Swiss-Prot record:
This is Large ribosomal subunit protein uL30. Keywords: Ribonucleoprotein, Ribosomal protein. GO terms for molecular function: structural constituent of ribosome. It comes from Kineococcus radiotolerans (strain ATCC BAA-149 / DSM 14245 / SRS30216). Belongs to the universal ribosomal protein uL30 family. The gene is rpmD. InterPro entries: Ribo_uL30_ferredoxin-like_sf (IPR036919), Ribosomal_uL30_bac-type (IPR005996), Ribosomal_uL30_CS (IPR018038), Ribosomal_uL30_ferredoxin-like (IPR016082). SUPFAM superfamilies: Ribosomal protein L30p/L7e.
C-alpha cells in the first residue's frame, strides 16, 4: 500500500474549527511538521479538507 507524507505549511489559527480539528487528527501541531500515513480514502478526505494548509507527497 502506498504511503503519503503530509507536511503542514500554514497555521490553523483563524481557520474554521473543523479544519483545526482535522489538522490535529492528522497529527499535525506545528508548521513544518510532517507525518507519514497509509493512503486510505479516510486519510485522503482529511487531507482534502485542509489541502490549503498542507502539502502531500508519495513515499515508498
Amino acid at each position: 500500500m502506498a504511503r503519503l507524507k503530509v507536511t503542514q505549511i500554514n497555521s490553523g489559527i483563524g481557520r474554521k474549527q473543523n479544519q483545526r480539528e482535522t489538522l490535529r487528527s492528522l497529527g499535525l501541531h506545528k508548521i513544518g511538521q510532517s507525518v507519514v500515513k497509509d493512503d486510505k480514502p479516510e486519510f485522503r478526505g482529511m487531507v482534502n479538507t485542509v489541502s490549503h494548509l498542507v502539502t502531500v507527497e508519495e513515499v515508498d
